[in-house]
Curated annotation (Swiss-Prot):
Family: Belongs to the EPSP synthase family.
Name the record gives this protein: 3-phosphoshikimate 1-carboxyvinyltransferase
Organism: Xanthomonas oryzae pv. oryzae (strain KACC10331 / KXO85)
Catalytic activity line of the entry: 3-phosphoshikimate + phosphoenolpyruvate = 5-O-(1-carboxyvinyl)-3-phosphoshikimate + phosphate
GO biological process: amino acid biosynthetic process; aromatic amino acid family biosynthetic process; chorismate biosynthetic process
Lineage: Bacteria, Pseudomonadati, Pseudomonadota, Gammaproteobacteria, Lysobacterales
HAMAP family reported for this sequence: EPSP_synth
Biochemical pathway: Metabolic intermediate biosynthesis; chorismate biosynthesis; chorismate from D-erythrose 4-phosphate and phosphoenolpyruvate: step 6/7
Protein task: Catalyzes the transfer of the enolpyruvyl moiety of phosphoenolpyruvate (PEP) to the 5-hydroxyl of shikimate-3-phosphate (S3P) to produce enolpyruvyl shikimate-3-phosphate and inorganic phosphate.
CDD domains: EPSP_synthase
Keyword match Lipid metabolism: no
EC top class named in words: transferase
Binding site for phosphoenolpyruvate: 26, 99, 127, 174, 351, 392
UniProt GO molecular function: 3-phosphoshikimate 1-carboxyvinyltransferase activity
Length: 440
C-alpha cells in the first residue's frame, strides 16, 4: 500500500537486505525547480522527488508563468523565464507543508514587481517566519506575517532591494538561501555569515547554474544583477530519507543493505558521524558528483551500538535526522545524550517532545531537557504512537517497531508522502514488518 494511509502497524520483520533506491533529495528538488525557473533556457531535472512538498513548489512556479513538463514521475523539464520573467499569480500560492519552499520563495518574491501571498497547511502555518522576514526587511523588502510571526506571508512587490552583510543569529540553510535569492536582485553585494555552517545546497546549485558566488563553511557572498544559465540536474537520493534505513539496518540483527547514490553534502551527514561514534558499520562506495552535490552508495551492516554524547557541533548537520537517531539510541547499550538541539521544537512538530513521549509510551526511559534529551538504551515494548502529522516522527516509529516485543501502531501517517512517497512499500520489500491500513 502507499504511504497515503492513516496508520501503520509495525512489528519485527526479518533482517534487512537488498540494494535500495531512495527517492530524490527534497531540498535539492525544491532548489532545482526554483533555479531552473529563473534560468535562461531549458533545464532537465532527473531524480526529482515526486512528493507533496516538491509538487507544491513546482505548482507555484506554474502559477508564476513557468512551463514545467513531467515526462515521468521523477523527471521535470523546466522552461526558464529568466530572473525577470515571473508573472503575477492569480490567488494565493500554496506551499503545502514545505517550509523550505515558503522561506526560499519569500526571498525570491520579495524582489518581484508584483504582490503575492504565501500560504501553507496547518502545520506550516504554525512555523516561525520572522527569522526570514527580518533580514529581508533589512534589504528593503516588505513582508507581512501574522502577529506571532507565522504564515500567511503577504509579500509587497515593487521594492528596491539593496545588498546587506547579514550575520544570522540562527544556523539555518533556509534563512541563508532566502537572503541569497533576494541578493540576486539587490543592488550591490549580499553576504551571509552563520553561527555554525549549514547545508550549502543553494550555493552549490547557484554555481552550477552559472552564478558567481563565493562560499565556504559558514559564509556566502554574491553580487546582484547576475543571470542564471540553464543546466541539467541529477538529484541525488535524499539523505534524510535514507537515514531511516541506515538506522534500521544498524539495529536489526544480521541486516546488510546498500543505499544507492545517496547525497552526502558535508553539512547534511552529521548522522553518519554520530552513528559511527556509537559503533555503526557504515561504508561509502562509488563516490561521484551530481549537480555539484557529492554522492556515494552507502553499505550498512548491523553492529551493536553503544550510547554516546552527541557533539553539539554535529547538531546543525543532522537536524532532520534526530528522530531516527533517537531510535538508534534506544537500541544502544548505555545512555545517549543530545544537547543544543532546541531547533527541533519548531519543526513540523515539537520533535523533542514527540520522540520523548513516544519512546516512553514504548517503555523506554527518556529524560527530556529544553534543548535535548538523554535516552537510556533498553527494550522496546508495544504501544500506540501519535505522529502529530509529522512524517519523520512516523517513519522513526516504524523503525522502532522492528525491535518491539509486540507491535507499534503509528497514527496519522499520511504526511509521509510529503518527503518519502512509497516508504512503506520499500520498507516491506527490505524486510520491515509493516502493515498500512485505513483508520476506522
Amino acid at each position: 500500500m502507499s504511504s497515503n494511509t492513516h496508520h501503520w502497524i509495525a512489528r519485527r520483520g526479518t533482517a534487512l537486505q537488498g540494494s535500495l533506491a531512495i527517492p530524490g533529495d527534497k531540498s535539492v528538488s525544491h532548489r532545482a525547480v526554483m533555479f531552473a525557473a529563473l534560468a535562461d533556457g531549458v533545464s532537465q531535472i532527473d531524480g526529482f522527488l515526486e512528493g507533496e512538498d516538491t509538487r507544491s513548489t513546482a505548482a507555484i512556479f506554474a502559477k508564476l508563468g513557468v512551463r514545467i513538463e513531467t515526462p515521468s514521475a521523477s523527471q521535470r523539464i523546466v522552461h526558464g523565464v529568466g530572473v525577470d520573467g515571473l508573472q503575477p499569480p492569480t490567488g494565493a500560492l500554496d506551499c503545502g507543508n514545505a517550509g523550505t519552499g515558503m522561506r526560499l520563495l519569500a526571498g525570491l518574491l520579495a524582489a518581484q514587481r508584483f504582490d503575492s501571498v504565501l500560504v501553507g497547511d496547518e502545520s506550516l502555518s504554525k512555523r516561525p517566519m520572522r527569522r526570514v522576514t527580518g533580514p529581508l526587511a533589512q534589504m528593503g523588502a516588505r513582508i507581512d506575517t501574522q502577529d506571532d510571526g507565522t504564515p500567511p506571508l503577504r509579500v509587497h512587490g515593487g521594492q528596491a532591494l539593496h545588498g546587506i552583510d547579514f550575520v544570522s543569529p540562527v544556523a539555518s540553510a533556509q534563512v541563508k538561501s532566502a537572503v541569497l535569492l533576494a541578493g540576486l536582485y539587490a543592488q550591490g553585494e549580499t553576504s551571509v555569515t552563520e553561527p555554525h555552517p549549514t547545508r550549502d545546497y543553494s550555493e552549490r546549485m547557484l554555481s552550477a547554474f552559472g552564478v558567481d558566488i563565493d562560499f565556504s563553511p559558514g559564509s556566502a557572498r554574491l553580487r546582484g544583477g547576475q543571470r542564471l544559465r540553464a543546466t541539467d540536474i541529477a538529484v541525488p537520493a535524499d539523505f534524510s530519507s535514507a537515514a531511516f534505513f541506515i538506522v534500521a539496518a544498524s539495529i536489526v540483527p544480521d541486516s546488510e543493505v546498500v543505499l544507492r547514490a545517496v547525497g552526502l553534502n558535508p553539512r547534511r551527514t552529521g548522522l553518519l558521524a554520530a552513528l559511527r561514534l556509537m559503533g555503526a558499520d557504515i561504508s561509502e562506495e562509488n563516490h561521484a558528483e551530481h549537480g555539484g552535490e557529492p554522492v556515494a552508495d552507502l553499505r550498512v551492516r548491523y553492529a551493536p551500538l553503544r550510547g554516546a554524547q552527541i557533539p553539539e557541533a554535529l547538531v546543525p548537520d543532522m537536524i532532520d535526522e534526530f528522530p531516527a537517531l533517537f531510535v538508534a539510541a534506544t537500541a544502544a547499550s548505555g545512555q545517549t545524550v543530545v544537547t543544543g538541539a532546541a531547533e527541533l521544537r519548531v519543526k513540523e512538530s515539537d520533535r523533542l517532545a514527540a520522540m520523548a513521549t513516544g519512546l516512553r509510551t514504548l517503555g523506554v526511559q527518556v529524560d527530556e531537557t529544553p534543548d535535548g534529551a538523554t535516552i537510556h538504551g533498553g527494550s522496546i515494548g508495544s504501544g500506540v504512537i501519535e505522529s502529530h502529522g509529522d512524517h519523520r516522527i512516523a517513519m522513526a516509529f516504524a523503525i522502532a517497531g522492528q525491535l518491539s516485543s509486540g507491535s507499534v501502531r503509528v497514527n496519522d501517517v499520511a504526511n509521509v508522502a510529503t518527503s518519502f512517497p512509497g516508504f512503506d512499500t520499500l520498507a516491506q520489500g527490505a524486510g520491515f514488518g509493516l502493515e498500512a491500513a485505513e483508520s476506522g
